[in-house]
Swiss-Prot record:
Disulfide bridges in this chain: none
Organism this protein belongs to: Haemophilus ducreyi (strain 35000HP / ATCC 700724)
Gene: hflD
Localization (cell): Cytoplasm; Cell inner membrane
Top-level division of the source organism's lineage: Bacteria
NCBIfam families: PRK00218.1-2 (NF001246), PRK00218.1-4 (NF001248)
Protein name in the entry: High frequency lysogenization protein HflD homolog
Length: 215
């Protein structure tokens, strides 16, 4: 079966977007609310009709991730952000471990179903502080124990704040979800060695399509 680099790039952009959000929350204490919202919403899309449907069928919801993909795959004028690189590599590793652990996968599905039920208590606002805290708890209790803990670097003033910790962990959870998607559509670590240009070019094409549609 031919490798579908469109789907692989969409899923990888989801991973990179989560990694970028982690970096922004840890260093600035804030991130784009719309980007964070669309990233978190992807956690509750369990039966998508397409890969892009995980992000509400709109490539605009992945522009931050697509920009990061281009930088990570060779479009950053030689200035590779190794911190973001470390995040997405670790997110991928956790998603691969999750995929091989049926007990953890079952627990994750059940906990996300609980989140869906809880939404009605918060006017269906997935950005409600308690919902983000609950998603963070899922990451801490189910995902984090699967592998080495991801060391998040940033400003101590932000890193010690519970609300920032929750947003970071919720972002990591969404990244792991994108990592599962990446595996489902044929993503492979070998592609980062032998197909970097294909991934870069596809991300660039998606980004141009977004720019043209927003003009």
């Amino acid at each position: 079966m031919a490798t579908d680099y469109q789907d692989i790039t969409i899923a990888f952009a989801g991973i990179c977007q989560a990694a970028t959000l982690v970096q922004q929350f840890a260093n600035k204490g804030v991130a784009d609310r719309a980007v964070f919202s669309s990233t978190i919403k992807s956690l509750l899309v369990t039966q998508p009709q397409s890969t892009l449907a995980v992000y509400d069928g709109n490539i605009a919801h992945l522009t931050m991730g697509l920009a990061t993909v281009q930088a990570q795959m060779g479009g950053g004028n030689g200035k590779l952000d190794t911190e973001i690189g470390r995040y997405w590599i670790n997110i991928l590793a956790l998603s691969q471990k999750l995929n091989k652990d049926p007990v953890a996968k079952s627990q994750l599905i059940q906990r996300l179903k609980q989140i869906e039920r809880q939404l009605s208590l918060y006017d269906n606002d997935i950005m409600a502080d308690q919902i983000i805290a609950n998603l963070a708890a899922i990451y801490s209790e189910i995902i984090s124990p699967l592998g080495s803990k991801i060391q998040v670097l940033g400003l101590q003033d932000y890193l010690v704040r519970p609300d920032i910790q929750h947003k970071v962990r919720a972002s990591l959870l969404a990244g792991v979800r994108a990592g599962i998607l990446w595996q489902q559509v044929g993503g492979s670590r070998w592609q980062f060695l032998f197909s970097r240009k294909k991934i870069f070019n596809q991300a660039k094409l998606f980004y141009k399509d977004f720019e043209l549609s927003s003009d």
